[in-house]
Amino acid sequence: MGSSDVSSRECSLVYNEDPDFTDGTTPCDRLGVDLMNVLDDKDEIKQESVPVSDREIEDTESDASAVSSFASANELIAEPHAASETNLGTNGQDGRNVLEQQRDVVARLIEENKETQKEGDKVCIVPKVWYDKFFDPDVTDPEDIGPINTRMICRDFENFVLEDYNRCPYLSIAEPVFNFLSEIYGMTSGSYPVVTNLVINQTTGELETEYNKWFFRLHYLTEKQDGRKRRHGQDDSIMYLSMSALNLVRDLVEKSMNLFFEKADHLDVNAVDFKIWFVSEGSDIATDSNVSTFLNSSYEITPLQFLELPIKKLLIPDMFENRLDKITSNPSDLVIEIKPIEGNHHWPSNYFAYNKLEPASGTTGLVNLGNTCYMNSALQCLVHIPQLRDYFLYDGYEDEINEENPLGYHGYVARAFSDLVQKLFQNRMSIMQRNAAFPPSMFKSTIGHFNSMFSGYMQQDSQEFLAFLLDSLHEDLNRIIKKEYTEKPSLSPGDDVNDWNVVKKLADDTWEMHLKRNCSVITDLFVGMYKSTLYCPECQNVSITFDPYNDVTLPLPVDTVWDKTIKIFPMNSPPLLLEVELSKSSTYMDLKNYVGKMSGLDPNTLFGCEIFSNQIYVNYESTESNAQFLTLQELIKPADDVIFYELPVTNDNEVIVPVLNTRIEKGYKNAMLFGVPFFITLKEDELNNPGAIRMKLQNRFVHLSGGYIPFPEPVGNRTDFADAFPLLVEKYPDVEFEQYKDILQYTSIKVTDKDKSFFSIKILSVEKEQQFASNNRTGPNFWTPISQLNLDKATDIDDKLEDVVKDIYNYSSLVDCAEGVLMQVDDEGDTEGSEAKNFSKPFQSGDDEENKETVTNNENVNNTNDRDEDMELTDDVEEDASTEPELTDKPEALDKIKDSLTSTPFAILSMNDIIVCEWSELGSNEAFSDDKIYNWENPATLPNKELENAKLERSNAKERTITLDDCLQLFSKPEILGLTDSWYCPTCKEHRQATKQIQLWNTPDILLIHLKRFESQRSFSDKIDATVNFPITDLDLSRYVVYKDDPRGLIYDLYAVDNHYGGLGGGHYTAYVKNFADNKWYYFDDSRVTETAPENSIAGSAYLLFYIRRHKDGNGLGSSKLQEIIQKSRHGYDERIKKIYDEQMKLYEFNKTDEEEDVSDDMIECNEDVQAPEYSNRSLEVGHIETQDCNDEDDNDDGERTNSGRRKLRLLKKVYKNNSGLGSSSTSEISEGCPENEVADLNLKNGVTLESPE
């Protein structure tokens, strides 16, 4: 048959028509195991051996036929063309002919195999893409086909785990075909033959490839569990094995026991008996989440879990020769149990024939997984609430899981919490360590998955964790499947807020609206309502609203004030000191308003700055500062020097100009900053008036210096300029001085030399990037220069003045010069006419050089005479004289003056300039001497009676302890809202600093009180460690609850306290909890649990208080719906436990040993009510028998019973020792002593039976 007769498609379909394969399911899928993920977790895939059936299918005739009919690849190719003597190694043969020959051989082998194939024949699985390429007519060169790569279709060769078919399609070919192709093309590195069998489809009766082998999980039934440390380095990972449906039960037993003893290599195979239980997958497993969970996750299972398995078959020797598909139709779980040969022991599967389930003690600790104490302490407080515990312990929550809630977590959080509760409180076997700590790893993993805050191992806040957990449980268990849209009820305009019925109706409507969207066990137990009242200070409008809560955050009435001494620089009085105390949460605006209130100044005229190194360091009005959002404690440090400047501004045309002070100290050439910077305000027309600028500065210095400096008085508003300023009129005869009257009014006619020794004015221009701009506010632009300015760039104010203005501003210098000339003339005895002539033009330059010399000589004489008396003063005068403009009466000079007057005036100050007042050392010392009562270095203290009274009150209250009542009173105390959280009044249509009061309208059954020990304001946090005295019992909330007619009562008892030790940087959480199982108090410190007294919880570490309502009507906690759920689920739980005991007794009758056969019925009856003392747990070995205590008649003198009748199960030993047939008198006896129909009638659970071999 040629290659054209058999297409690729025909060949591929021969072994690919498999219903089990095409339905898309695998044994892993049916067991609910994602084996792909399991395999991904392996360090490496085992590929050491070719995976075939564990036991060769015993079909010797078929194997012999296959072997005898198989020849080498070259022989098979050469047979149809013997004359050509074809050899694949010959390079001369054309590639196309070689490939066609190969295809012919493969097609012939396939056709021959069709005629002889039968069940059990081996087939090999290859990638479909390779197979199609081999038969592709377009491929003519064998080199293009390449080796067979089975790694792409098989993930685990040992366990026969194939890749997803949709991802990597594959098909099967007969083993001879695969051998032929692999001999020619070989296999890629790491690839192995993927061998399986042909099986008969039980439905269609046709042969098909066994793509899906039987898949088993292996479990170990043991009594020694519950989180104990595993000896010999064992882990709890499940073992998997795969078998062909054609394999025998013997093969399954051998492979299972080999894997088991390979894992449990510490056991001596000759020292133990064993049994293997076959657990089929039934519908119960799919519906029983508990069974499904431990089957999917645990290698070791407990006797209790074993009894809950739905279908159990004991594998006995009579089954060993049966094929697997004859005893089950689905892949299953295998459970192995062992029993030591020596000593008196019983099978773990018979555990409950001798032991009762013991109720949990309620004192199980939680292992710290790494900074998880915040979680452990909160969980201990939560799980010890009886109603919440029972709701999850008895699985009452299952019917209320809301997986459709978009705000929830599809029930994962609820299930994780339930699993935790059951691990802590479920009835347990006595063999288990009663108080062994439990690691809440799965719970933490679930919580961390849905909230990244709790995913790592950083310390977190216990209250934040608790709030998230309660909210998650609420949404996962919300009974409202579809939340309808609701609007929050509110009072109508005209409703009387003083009418109790109106207010109560609003509260009832709000609660009803809340329950339309929120109804769960959390709502039943933890949720109450606040009443919030807002009073508008302007229109007296009152707003009342109600809001739900699940915890009450109480402030602590402790000294948490921020205190600081602030300087105030009023405009028209000396500097002041004001001691301030405000709340640590206060803002800069609160401080500003407080300073204005206590000083009597308008807060809108106050500008705050921090001063450092004689200059402005921080401008609190600037948008670049943090004053807009930081608290005072974060904004202003204790060492900061804070000054509030009063700058009254009447209109937008006024400009605020910063002023710095410098002086040249002895031994220095350059001026250095000193004193305190300040500000002056100038009107727009004063910016070019040097006299006005100087007058403003002098007025400020008078107040800043304590009123000492005797600055000369200006002439004021005068019109007789010729009489007041004769020298100016004489120097500028053509100038109309009326236009300079605004400048002339600030000029002094006569000054002394001491005047110029105080300060000179310089102007320093600052770039915009060197400014701190003000915040967006009305009025002038308030700005401050940045620090580290280059003061050497400051220019003298004279350099910015035109000649006439300069002479007006420096008129005192003209007077000084004129007086100096007259004095010199008098000394030389000139004639009267000459004197008059010279005086009339004292600075006439003309052609008379003698006058210049006279003036010069006169100045030198004065300088010489004055130097001894006051050298510093002389230097200043000399410097000023040198800057005087030269007076002239030349026509060109007058023209120049006229031109300057008609030109645009030159601005002295611009918006980016600052004033630098340069003082002489002598002048600064004289003006700001230490003998002043008040000055800028020693401000006057402003009395603060309000602060003094507050300090006195705190001093008297130091000995008084803080109580929970104090906290509750402070909680309901009305407070005035700040500027940053003002309320929008609907009547005023404005944001108002309203008065707000929050009160408890009602309280829930579980009252969670959060003591606000942590104060966090953005970047700053602090902790309050003060002790709050809270009652252990009889907390009466009737004084603090508005709705006092609650029929449930308002008396509460403490049952738990969550503690925090340490500070914000690091700490530790613990819990005091009342255990309702024994009504004792315990201290839970992660895994350590000790008995304690509740009074020990009253300490500065108490953080969260849990109170439970004492119902006066006798009803239970929570809603009637919750009580009904708990009662029903508890009844179901009790029935389940009873069923377990019943099942155990049935199993015991089937499973008991020879020794147990001899135990009297009285001993078994003795165990129905109490654990029989003869089956005590003197060690961790259960089943040690001392019969004399239960039945004295059965005493033996030697105290030990012989083992003459023990029959042992020796299956595995025979395999290990001599590889002979498996058999055991013990298990065989079970089959012999229990007829087949009786075995089938042993109901264990839900009508499922133990089955005997067919």
Swiss-Prot record:
GO-annotated cellular components: cytoplasm; nuclear replication fork; nucleus
GO molecular function annotation: cysteine-type deubiquitinase activity
Keyword Protease recorded: yes
Residue ranges annotated for the DUSP domain, each copy included: 97-199
Record's compositionally biased regions (Low complexity): 854-864
A family per Pfam: UCH
GO biological process: DNA damage response; negative regulation of mitochondrial fusion; protein deubiquitination; proteolysis
Region annotated Disordered, chain positions: 827-893, 1188-1207
SMART domains the UniProt entry points to: DUSP
Gene3D superfamilies from the UniProt entry: Cysteine proteinases, DUSP-like
Skewed-composition ranges (Acidic residues): 867-883, 1189-1198
Active site residues per record: 373, 1068
Keyword presence, Ribosomal protein: no
Location of the USP domain: 364-1110
Entry EC no(s): 3.4.19.12
Residue list for modification Phosphoserine: 84, 1160
Endpoints of the signal sequence: none
Subunit note: Interacts with FZO1.
Family membership noted in the UniProt record: Belongs to the peptidase C19 family.
Note: Present with 7110 molecules/cell in log phase SD medium.
Annotated function: Ubiquitin carboxyl-terminal hydrolase that recognizes ubiquitin chains that stabilize FZO1 and promote mitochondrial fusion. UBP12 deubiquitylates FZO1 only after oligomerization.
Protein name: Ubiquitin carboxyl-terminal hydrolase 12
